[in-house]
Amino acid sequence: MASILTLDGLYAEVPKFLPEALREGCAGKNPLSFYIQQILNLMGCDGNEYHVLFTSSSEEANTHMIMAAVRRHLLRTQQRPHVIIGAGEPPSITECVKALAQEKRCVYTIIPLKNFEIDPVAVYDAIQSNTCLACISGTNAVVKTFNKLQDISKVLRGIPLHSEVSDLVYQGCIKQNPPADSFSINSLYGFLGVGILGMKKKVMQGLGPLIFGGGLRGGSPNIPGIHAMYRTLTQQRPSIKKINTIHKLFMKTLKKHQHVYLPIGGVSAEDMSTKDMSTKDIPSTDMLVGPKGLPGYILFSVGHRAEELQKKIFTKFNIKIGRIVDLQEILFRIKIPQKYWETLLFIQLRDNLTKEDIKRVMVVLMHLDTITPRGSLPPPSYSSSFS
């Protein structure tokens, strides 16, 4: 990604592939029940209360849980089921729910972000008599902020909460039981084709045969991939203290230096004339409306490669309208000393950050936390600001 305001590099160390773990898994020394118990232990789960199903990915786990909850509701009542999802959920959740809605199998409500988090009060206000499931991830998929799952679970009052908790599990944030009725975890490798659908046994019993009869991946379990996931969780977890430090610094900096925004709802071509939008503010000619509920981004434009990375960002998040400014202008207006310019430029132009990169980022974040912006760039008139 192309700016210091993406947490993929700052937030946690990326787990490395362990070829020896894959070989150990191929040896088949441990039965499947061993991994079920060990992964439950790593999450602080009581084996008497939780059960684990291994799937081909977290995407399959998410889709399977949503389908089971919707089908159960349709079998039991004449009402069309209602699903609550948070803004910035993984595509496997949003696309599944939207596809069901197009088929008139369910209706849904998207909870917008407030201060980069899902507000439990907004979740409570969205509850309807036919609400059958809420899907709120442990970390926001866009800016990687923590969601208050425990508070959200309380306001749901018995409505099942499904959560994608890969980041929380890998970082060791869950000390005792995931604050959700069901949860999904990816392989931490992607290409190994293994994921987890975990759930409370009472939820599983309520779903009945639907949770098993929905067509889970056929064939024998991917024991080598499951073993590699287990080894990653036990050996490669980053320091939670370091993660929390970076996260707090990042959030303080993000809330303090608000300069350039992308519109949350997008802007139509008809609105351009009324809002004095300059054509130079538009990255390309084929503009579409951006998704609702996404937070703002700060995007820097320096050099040919940076522009290419920006196009990738716009494409990835389906955002087609935004103001792009010059990095030097940003740095000058918020009084960042020139000695830090190279670091920010370096971070912008790298796709993956190393441990040394993270140390350099920490220096910049700590400096930004000690200064007061002067003459910060105002948000464009057509754009929504952070709350």
UniProtKB/Swiss-Prot annotation:
**Which organism is this entry from?**
African swine fever virus (isolate Tick/South Africa/Pretoriuskop Pr4/1996)
User: Which keywords does this Swiss-Prot/TrEMBL entry list?
Assistant: Late protein, Virion
Which GO cellular component terms are attached?
Answer: virion component
The entry's pyridoxal 5'-phosphate-binding residues are: S58, E59, S184, I185, N186
Cofactors, names only: pyridoxal 5'-phosphate
The UniProt induction remark is:
Expressed in the late phase of the viral replicative cycle.
UniProt-recorded name of the protein? NifS-like protein
> What InterPro entries does this protein's entry cite?
Aminotrans_V_dom, PyrdxlP-dep_Trfase, PyrdxlP-dep_Trfase_major, PyrdxlP-dep_Trfase_small
Q: Where in the cell is it found?
A: Virion
Q: Which family does it belong to?
A: Belongs to the class-V pyridoxal-phosphate-dependent aminotransferase family. NifS/IscS subfamily.
Predominantly, its location class is virion
Q: Name one Pfam family in it.
A: Aminotran_5
